[in-house]
Amino acid sequence: MSATPSQRTVALAGLIGILGALLGGLGECALHYSASGSENAETYRFFVDLAPWRLSTGHFLSIFAIPLYFIGYWHLYERLKPAPQWARLTILLLGLYAFTLGDAWLGSRVYLAQLAQARAVAESAGDTVTIKLLSALLAQACFYNENILIGVRAGVLVISILYVVFVLRGKTSYPRWMAALNPILLVIAAFILYVAIPPIGGIFMPVAMNFAHVVFFSASTALTLRSTPAGQ
């Protein structure tokens, strides 16, 4: 039987999860943030004027940061005790699965950006043949890239449902109010903020999943630190 990890170890895992969500969000913001918001998002026009440093920084920062989510989900696995093992393990495995897909999605965004930028150059030159070719390639790349998000969102939705059920039943070490800080509800909050206050919400909307997990892991880690006995 494996030894039970100390509260300090669990808290450290939470801090690493926060770091992953924060750095992943900064990387994704570098890739996706546009002052025009989601205008023309379906054609990837926001990629056209993206500075090379933002493309490189956003790409590498996000793909190297997202795997830190795995440690954050181990933190959650431990914090959900004494919920049933099957529920905690399901949440852990779904977290690993969803954010493996998320990293694959983020890793291929750079190629969409390059296609969008190349098409813009062809448009400036009036090269209709190249425009047609690049538009077709961009549409195909969009199909293969964007559909990965279905798995990410479905995984996080199931995680959130299981989490809420067991927290509200008092089957975990969390207080019941923590049920409100589930990832899906926080993602929805980011979109509501975008609709209500676009200048502020426009910063959080492109990184809604990362924003949700910064808040989620931060609240969980703060509770862990508060409950950690001195010297443990």
Where are these regions (language model features)?
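Hydrophobic, aromatic-enriched alpha-helical segments typical of multi-pass transmembrane helices
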Residues: 2-232
